[in-house]
Regions:
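Long, low-complexity inter-transmembrane loops of multi-pass membrane transporters
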Residues: 2-54, 234-313, 512-593
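C-terminal ends and interior cores of transmembrane alpha-helices
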Residues: 138-152, 391-404
C-alpha cells in the first residue's frame, strides 16, 4: 500500500519554507502557522467563567445559544432586504437619468462577506465567540453609519465602501463566528443546529423588507440607515451575551471514523462524567450537555482539507446552488414590476406588492435553512444536496415557461421553491464540512467556501445585470422575455455542472482516505464495495501488490479490475488507520504540527 499521503503536511511545510529570500520565508511561515492552528484553547479560568452567561448572571445551558444565534443572524440578515433601498438611492444619488448603481452595493457586501470569512476563519476558530462576534457587530454598525453619511453626501463610492466593504467585513466575521459557536454545541444534530442558526439570516428580509419600506416612506435615507444600524446593534449586543463555547471534550477530536450502521448514542445516566461534564459542574440533578460515545477518530489538518478534491467539488456545487436565488433576491422587485407590473408593455398593478413578495421569499429562505438542515441529519448531506440542485434545475426549466404564459403565481411559486433550496444549502453546508473535515476546521473551511458566495454575488450579479443592460442598450424593453431566458440559460448550465460535481464528492471519510496502491488508476464504490482499476505494465502489475484472496479480479494485458470484499476493505482500512496514528504521534512529538 502507498501511504505517502500520510506525511503530506510535513512535506507541505518543508517545501513552503524553501522559497527565495528570508522575508518571503517569514511570510510563508506566518501564513502556514496561521492556517495550521485552528483550535480554541481555553484557560481553566475561562472555562469556569463560561459556565455563566449574560454578564455572569445566568447559568449557561446548551439550548441558549440557538435562540441567541438566530437573533444575531436575523439582524445580519437585514442585508437581504437591501433591494428596498435600490430605487430610492438611485433616484437620490444617480448621476444621470436611468443610471443604476445601488444594486452594486449588495453584491459588494456579500462578496466581502465571503472573503472576510476565508481570511478570518482560523482567527475566529481560535478566539472566544463573544470576542469575534462583538468585533463583527461593531464593524457592521460602522458600515451603517458610513452608509448614512454616503447618502447624505450623495456619494455612491462612499456607499460602496461603507455598506459594501465595511459592513461586509462585519457580516463575514459575525456570520461565521455565530454559526461556528452554535454548531459546536450539537455534534449529534449539526444539520439542525446550523440550520437553525442561519435560519435567522435567511429570515432577515422577512421583517426588514417591511421595516425598510416604512423607514423609506417616513424618514429620509440617512436617518433610515442610522435607525436600522442602531437598532440591530442594540439587539445583537444583548444577544451575544448568551454565546459561549462548549466545555472541553464536548466534541470528537477529528473526523469520526464510522460505519454506515453506526449512530450517535446518549450517555446512560450511570455513565462516568467526561472531562467536559466535570468542567461544567455535571453534578447530580444538573443536566450536562449530551456527549457522543467515544469512537475512533481521524485527525484531518486544514491543509489536508483544502487540498482535497472533494472540498473543491463541494465548493463548485455550493456556488451552483446559490447563484440563481442570489441574483433573484436583489432583483425580485424589478422582475415583478417589469414582467407583471407597471413596467409591462400594458401597465397594470402586480398581483402582489413587491415588498410582500420579498418578505415571503425571506420566509421560504428561512424555512429552507432549518428544514433542509434537519433533513440532512436524517438521510445524509450528499443526498439532500443533490436533491437541492435537481429541484433548481427543474425550476429553471419551467420559469421561462411561466413568464411566456404570463402566469405570475406560477413564476413566484417557482422562485419561492428555488429559495427553499438556496436557504437549505446555507443551512447544511457547515454541518457537511464538519462531518467531512472535523469540527476544528469548520470555521476555516466554512469561511473559504463562502468565497463562493462572493463569486456568485459579484460575478453572478454583474453578469445578470450586464445581460439585462446589453439587451436594453440594443433597443429591447425590460419586459422582453429574451432577456431573462438568456440569463436563466447560463445559470441552468452552471447548476448542472454543480450537480455533476456533487455526484463525485466522497462524503465518507473512508472513501476519501482509503489507501491507494502505487499502480492504482481509479477507485469507486459500487453497491457498497470498493472497485479498483490497476495498471499493468509489461505483463506485470505496475507496482508491488500483495496477493489478495476472496476479491473478484479480471486481468487484461493493460489493466486489472478488482472488486474487494468487505473483509479485505476493512483490513486495508485498519492498517491505514494504525499507520496514520503512529505517524500523527511522531509528528506531534517532534513538534512539527
Amino acid at each position: 500500500m502507498n501511504h505517502a499521503a500520510v506525511g503530506d503536511d510535513i512535506l507541505f511545510s518543508r517545501m513552503s519554507l524553501h522559497g527565495g529570500g528570508r522575508g518571503r520565508q517569514g511570510l510563508v511561515r506566518t501564513i502556514i502557522e496561521y492556517f495550521s492552528h485552528t483550535e480554541y484553547q481555553a484557560t481553566r479560568e475561562q472555562v469556569e467563567r463560561d459556565r455563566f452567561v449574560f454578564f455572569g448572571l445566568i447559568r449557561c445551558q446548551p439550548w441558549m445559544v440557538i435562540p441567541a444565534g438566530i437573533i444575531i443572524q436575523f439582524c445580519y440578515g437585514s442585508v437581504y432586504a437591501w433591494s428596498i433601498f435600490n430605487d430610492p438611492i438611485n433616484q437620490l444619488v444617480a448621476t444621470a437619468p436611468g443610471t443604476d448603481g445601488a444594486e452594486v452595493t449588495f453584491y459588494i457586501a456579500l462578496g466581502v462577506l465571503g472573503l472576510t470569512g476565508a481570511i478570518c476563519g482560523p482567527w475566529i476558530e481560535k478566539n472566544h465567540p463573544r470576542k469575534s462576534g462583538a468585533i463583527g457587530m461593531v464593524v457592521f454598525y460602522a458600515g451603517h453609519l458610513t452608509a448614512a453619511l454616503a447618502v447624505h453626501m450623495r456619494m455612491l463610492s462612499l456607499l460602496y465602501f461603507g455598506y459594501g466593504f465595511v459592513a461586509g467585513v462585519g457580516l463575514g466575521i459575525g456570520y461565521v463566528s455565530t454559526i461556528d459557536a452554535v454548531n459546536k454545541w450539537w455534534p449529534r444534530a449539526r444539520g439542525t443546529a446550523s440550520g437553525c442558526a442561519v435560519m435567522g439570516f435567511g429570515g432577515g428580509s422577512l421583517a426588514f423588507s417591511a421595516l425598510n419600506k416604512w423607514l423609506v416612506d417616513n424618514t429620509d435615507l440617512p436617518m433610515a440607515f442610522l435607525i436600522l444600524g442602531s437598532m440591530t446593534f442594540a439587539v445583537m449586543l444583548l444577544s451575544i451575551q448568551f454565546m459561549c463555547p462548549p466545555p472541553p471534550g464536548h466534541n470528537p477530536d477529528g473526523v469520526v471514523v464510522v460505519d454506515e450502521s453506526e449512530t450517535w448514542q446518549l450517555k446512560q445516566p450511570d455513565a462516568p462524567h467526561t472531562a467536559g461534564e466535570k468542567a461544567w459542574g455535571g453534578a447530580k440533578g444538573t443536566p450536562a450537555p449530551p456527549q457522543p460515545r467515544q469512537r475512533q477518530t481521524l485527525s484531518v489538518s486544514l491543509s489536508e482539507a483544502l487540498r482535497s478534491r472533494d472540498y473543491w467539488l463541494l465548493y463548485v456545487a455550493f456556488l451552483s446552488n446559490i447563484v440563481f436565488c442570489l441574483v433573484v433576491i436583489s432583483n425580485l422587485p424589478r422582475l415583478i414590476d417589469s414582467l407583471f407590473g407597471m413596467g409591462r408593455a400594458v401597465p397594470r398593478s402586480p398581483p402582489m406588492p413587491t415588498y410582500i413578495a420579498v418578505s415571503v421569499e425571506g420566509a421560504f429562505n428561512m424555512l429552507g435553512r432549518v428544514l433542509v438542515g434537519a433533513l440532512s441529519d436524517l438521510v445524509g448531506r450528499k443526498t439532500v444536496f443533490l436533491l437541492l440542485l435537481l429541484v433548481q434545475i427543474i425550476v429553471l426549466i419551467f420559469v421561462p415557461i411561466a413568464i411566456h404564459v404570463d402566469s405570475f403565481w406560477a413564476f413566484i411559486g417557482l422562485i419561492w421553491t428555488a429559495t427553499v433550496c438556496y436557504g437549505g444549502g446555507f443551512g447544511m453546508i457547515p454541518a457537511f464540512l464538519a462531518d467531512m473535515f472535523g469540527i476544528n476546521n469548520t470555521s476555516s473551511c466554512h469561511g473559504i467556501i463562502l468565497t463562493a458566495w462572493s463569486i456568485a454575488s459579484i460575478v453572478g450579479g454583474m453578469t445578470f445585470t450586464g445581460v439585462v443592460n446589453r439587451f436594453l442598450s440594443d433597443g429591447a424593453h425590460a419586459y422582453d422575455e429574451k432577456i431573462y431566458v438568456t440569463n436563466f440559460a447560463w445559470i441552468l448550465v452552471l447548476i448542472v455542472i454543480g450537480f455533476v460535481c456533487c455526484l463525485f464528492v466522497r462524503a465518507s471519510i473512508r472513501d476519501r482516505m482509503f489507501p491507494a496502491l502505487p499502480n492504482q488508476v481509479m477507485r469507486l464504490r459500487i453497491f457498497g464495495r470498493v472497485f479498483r482499476v490497476l495498471s499493468v505494465r509489461n505483463g506485470r502489475l505496475g507496482g508491488a501488490a500483495e496477493p489478495r484472496t476472496g476479491s473478484w479480479r479480471l486481468r487484461t494485458r493493460f489493466v486489472e479490475l478488482e472488486y474487494l470484499t468487505k473483509a479485505e476493505e476493512q483490513t486495508a482500512w485498519e492498517e491505514y488507520l494504525a499507520l496514520r496514528a503512529v505517524q500523527h504521534r511522531l509528528i506531534s512529538e517532534q513538534g512539527v504540527c
